[in-house]
């Protein structure tokens, strides 16, 4: 992409409109001045640029050519035009390498930093967390060098998100902690609020429930009840109490939230009833648990189909816990169909593991082997080597019990190859 100097723009525009230098003459603009500007012997002044732009527009009108031009275009340097071009490109959904090439050529630091940040967003959306992290880090280095500190909290937040989504929760906490400190320093309350939620979530993931609960309380100070994240934070709070066995407190939180949602088919109500179903199940209250799951199922079937698989697969445990395996299997399979439709990897895995446990309980070896192979494919697709190793070991033991030495050996070899 070539960007023209002011002198080149005048010359190229004049030729395009089939004008001679004398056609641009005016009371205060001589042909000699035009010639000197076109040969870079004189700089283009603003008052001259205004007059030339008017001449060009007038000629374009005579030729019936749609032609947008003004003095700002004529006065801009190649670097300024390059910056405008790159900014427009960065607004698009596709971020290509041409942008960084132009930014490097003209040393456009703001464009470079923005390019790497957008590239990070693109990699993050594609779940390429390592490359997303690298690009956010590149962006942050440029902003730091350029003393543009206001964006730093956001970039540390994004770097933490990369680590958290890659299940590296301790690493994520390091970046989230830095993000929180910078967000306070630069009075970025929006990022400060966001990062507190994710800090709490990471603490829960690594079983530090007391720290998670303390962080949630800090987060709730920033929240208002019209914000969905107010509910998400309370969901997280309830889940922490569930994890430490305080089921009644967890139930009380959900019941309180339920009263704050007036719409009978709010998707958040589906989540609340689903989790109440899980809590009552953990307490051994199968009747109330089933009632809650059925309410959640009705809501999600109407307004939140992408999460319907969660309710179905969680609901199946009401039946498997009471050894009603036929009904449990039927419900799990319905959940798996929904999970497949909405590409829900977590619940595809969860549902198949539920089937695995049932088939183990009823000693259905044929179906047990089938579901193990399904799980293996899911784990391979997501590079989950640690669980895959355990699964291959389980399969090899099943084959050994059947005296199928070759199949058992094949599973052990597959397990070994994961680490080669």
Model-derived regions, located:
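A short, Lys/Arg-rich alpha-helix, primarily the initiator
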Residues: 1-17
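DNA major-groove recognition helix of helix-turn-helix/homeodomain DNA-binding modules
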Residues: 45-69
């Amino acid at each position: 992409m070539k960007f023209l100097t002011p002198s080149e723009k005048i010359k190229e525009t004049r030729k395009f409109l089939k004008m001679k230098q004398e056609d641009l003459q005016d009371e205060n603009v001589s042909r000699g001045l035009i010639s000197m500007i076109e040969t870079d012997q004189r700089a283009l002044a603003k008052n001259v640029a205004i007059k030339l732009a008017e001449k060009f527009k007038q000629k374009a009108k005579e030729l019936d050519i749609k032609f947008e031009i003004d003095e700002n275009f004529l006065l801009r340097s190649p670097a300024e035009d390059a910056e405008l071009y790159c900014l427009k490109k960065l607004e698009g959904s596709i971020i290509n390498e041409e942008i960084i090439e132009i930014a490097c050529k003209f040393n456009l630091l703001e464009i470079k930093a923005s390019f790497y940040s957008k590239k990070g967003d693109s990699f993050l959306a594609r779940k390429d967390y390592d490359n997303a992290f690298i690009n956010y880090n590149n962006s942050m280095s440029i902003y730091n060098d350029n003393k543009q500190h206001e964006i730093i909290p956001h970039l540390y937040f994004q770097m933490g998100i990369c680590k958290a989504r890659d299940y590296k929760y301790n690493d994520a906490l390091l970046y989230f902690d830095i993000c929180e400190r910078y967000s306070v320093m630069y009075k970025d309350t929006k990022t400060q609020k966001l990062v507190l939620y994710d800090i709490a979530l990471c603490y829960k993931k690594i079983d530090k429930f007391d720290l998670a609960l303390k962080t949630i309380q800090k987060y709730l100070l920033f929240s208002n009840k019209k914000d969905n994240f107010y509910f998400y934070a309370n969901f997280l709070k309830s889940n922490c109490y569930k994890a430490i066995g305080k089921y009644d407190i967890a139930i009380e939180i959900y019941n309180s939230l339920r009263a704050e949602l007036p719409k009978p088919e709010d998707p958040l109500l589906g989540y609340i009833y689903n989790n109440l179903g899980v809590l009552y199940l953990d307490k051994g209250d199968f009747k109330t648990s089933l009632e809650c799951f059925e309410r959640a199922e009705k809501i999600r079937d109407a307004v939140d189909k992408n999460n319907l698989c969660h309710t179905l697969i969680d609901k199946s445990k009401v039946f498997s816990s009471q050894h009603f395996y036929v009904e449990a299997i039927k419900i799990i399979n319905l959940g798996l169909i929904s999970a497949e439709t909405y590409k829900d990897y977590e619940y595809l895995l969860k549902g198949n593991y539920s089937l695995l446990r049932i088939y183990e309980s009823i000693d259905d070896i044929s179906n047990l082997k089938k579901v193990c192979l399904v799980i293996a494919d899911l784990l391979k697709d997501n590079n989950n080597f640690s669980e895959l190793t355990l699964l291959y070991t389980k399969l090899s033991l099943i084959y050994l019990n059947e005296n199928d030495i070759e199949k058992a050996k094949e599973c052990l070899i597959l397990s070994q190859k994961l680490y080669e």
